[in-house]
UniProtKB/Swiss-Prot annotation:
Organism name: Staphylococcus epidermidis (strain ATCC 12228 / FDA PCI 1200)
Functional summary from the UniProt entry: Could be involved in the uptake of ribose.
Name of the protein in its database record: Putative ribose uptake protein RbsU
Membrane topology label: Multi-pass membrane protein
Family, per entry: Belongs to the GRP transporter (TC 2.A.7.5) family.
Keywords, in A-Z order: Cell membrane, Membrane, Sugar transport, Transmembrane, Transmembrane helix, Transport
Residues annotated as transmembrane: 5-24, 34-51, 58-80, 95-114, 121-138, 153-170, 177-199, 212-234, 241-263, 273-292
Entry GO CC: plasma membrane
Molecular-function GO term, any one: carbohydrate transmembrane transporter activity
Length: 293
């Protein structure tokens, strides 16, 4: 593993770490955020496809790639709704924890990961630590009824959103399509869902004509940059899948801290300390789940 590989592996730290903060900073409704983000991702994917000479796949590879992108868009819409309730700095550790749990459980029960009783015990204990870490990131010193209600609603929303993120990661595994080949059709699937969602919400305003929707394209560039650098990082001649995944999960730290300091999603000193400990627990436990043989 060389310096260049590490730099590329940290690309998702910047892309996925800043994506929720930038999307929240531009503001707008979830429909504005998802439309702009998916259009930005599609633009990025088209440029990449033209640069590398990658065409659209055919057959079921195309279908599952479109479904994958649609799943992400569904999950991200739900996540944007959770941002409205508790802010990105609190929602991101929760959704990251749920995604780690979903990916790990899928790997165990569908792909045969963590063979043997000992590995399964270690793995499930690590998942428990991830949940504890996520809970620590939303702890507050003052018990406010409205916050507790919003937090419960956000957690339920993010649980539902995990279905979409699971589809995003699992659907391409139904074929032998590579990450680069799937990138463009995934982006197309994302935009299709975003357009449908925007049409369904026309009674609340025309997202296609609202300036903030087009500003959100910038947030989409950050998401797409993270996705691309993750694909490169996960290659065997770079960091490999396991190390690349762990490096990418550091994005939750940046997403949480930038939400606190740049979006004024304030925490007391004690809350901030407990949040940081919770984030460390999530990262350490996530690393354990990946490196279990």
């Amino acid at each position: 593993m060389d310096f260049i590989a590490i730099l590329i592996g940290l690309g998702p730290l910047l892309g996925w770490g800043l994506f929720p903060t930038i999307a929240s900073k531009f503001g707008g409704r979830p429909v504005n955020q998802i439309f702009g983000a998916t259009v930005g991702t599609l633009i990025f994917a088209i440029v990449l496809a033209l640069f590398k000479g990658i065409g659209l796949p055919g057959g079921m590879a195309l279908v599952f790639s479109l479904i994958s992108g649609a799943g992400w868009a569904f999950g991200q819409i739900i996540t944007f709704k959770a941002f409205e309730l508790v802010g990105s700095s609190r929602a991101m550790p929760i959704t990251t924890a749920f995604q780690l749990l979903g990916a790990s459980l899928w790997g165990v029960f569908a792909l045969g990961n963590w063979p043997g009783i000992t590995n399964k015990i270690i793995g499930f204990l690590a998942l428990l630590v991830i949940l504890i870490g996520a809970r620590m990131t939303v702890w507050t010193e003052t018990k406010q009824q409205e916050y507790s209600k919003n937090l419960r609603s956000a957690v339920l929303l993010l649980l539902v959103g995990e279905i979409g993120y699971w589809i995003y990661s699992a659907a391409p595994q139904a074929t032998d399509i590579g990450g680069f080949k799937a990138f463009l059709p995934q982006a197309i699937g994302m935009v299709i869902v975003a357009v449908i969602y925007a049409l369904m919400n026309m009674s609340k305003g025309n997202a296609f004509k609202e300036k903030v929707s087009w500003q959100q394209i910038i947030s989409g560039f950050f998401f797409a940059f993270a996705a691309l650098t993750y694909l490169i990082s996960a290659q065997p001649n770079m960091n490999g899948l396991a190390t690349g995944f762990v490096l990418s999960q550091t994005s939750v730290v940046l997403a949480t801290l930038t939400g606190i300091f740049f979006l004024n999603q304030k925490k007391t000193s004690k809350e901030l300390m407990i949040t940081i400990v919770g984030l460390v627990l999530i990262l350490v436990a996530a690393s354990i789940t990946v490196f279990i043989k």
